């Protein structure tokens, strides 16, 4: 078992959810728990949010949906964002999973199984309004508008779209997407709608519609919500090195003084990027400590020379992620995003849930 521990504060996640619910006021708020709850534990997070009356959970695939359904029971809505495919349609039906249909082919597949089961099957439709990943194209939407038989046999519960740049409040593309979405919705006046992701929630009430779908903001990846994650690693080795000693693979760091170097038991096999080599930092008792040398598969070295001697000992814990080094702050060091930091948290870490 790993010596490193990821601590997830479920109370913080619930408080983040309540903050988002307060912003949305009259709209429902669901939760994106895909990628195992952004690496933090989809089952544990979903169970915590159910306590706050969250009833809509978004996953990427049928496999994620089945795992969540087995853990949560039937009293919640589980939506599969990647939609339905021939190979998993029966599984979606068996586990009462609702696909988000992204193209006419997926609509055709879901209709086929509706006929096979001789009953209406629930679905969401995803209209592409400009992010250009998934979603029905404008031509496909026009076909649906002109031929409602294309939706025969389907229980259309929501029409959704996804914002491309919602974290930039003043970007005009947000309004372009909103207006495009509203124009499509005019042809489906009795269907509920969902547009806002985490950033979209803070763009204003016009973006909220009937259901918001935050992910990142639940996990503290937003300036207005709090970080619920702490990753700590103990010092497992200490050594005193003289001036001009080389550290790690390829000798990329050379000491410029007599130094005290500590080793921590995590590395790129645990999702801690090699890009942190010679430029990342950890914290010990609120003091910043630099990473020196290459990040290797299972180990990193840190320079603890400037710490008080009383704080340098085997077993002393270093904070890799926490209040001093949030996922977003860490990500900025290596030019990525906090989402990637969280979803890369390795399976070898012990996970501890509090709150």
Curated annotation (Swiss-Prot):
Catalytic residues at: 34 (proton acceptor), 249 (proton acceptor)
Q: What class of enzyme is it?
A: isomerase
The biological processes this protein is annotated with in GO are:
D-alanine biosynthetic process
Q: Which SMART domains match?
A: Ala_racemase_C
Give the matching CDD domains: PLPDE_III_AR
Q: One GO cellular component from the entry?
A: cytosol
Pathway(s) per entry? Amino-acid biosynthesis; D-alanine biosynthesis; D-alanine from L-alanine: step 1/1
Tell me the keywords, alphabetical order: Isomerase, Pyridoxal phosphate
> Which co-factor is required?
pyridoxal 5'-phosphate
Q: Where does substrate bind?
A: 133, 297
Which reactions appear under catalytic activity for this entry?
L-alanine = D-alanine
What is the stated purpose of this protein?
Catalyzes the interconversion of L-alanine and D-alanine. May also act on other amino acids.
**Any idea what this protein is called?**
Alanine racemase
Q: Give the species this sequence originates from.
A: Rickettsia peacockii (strain Rustic)
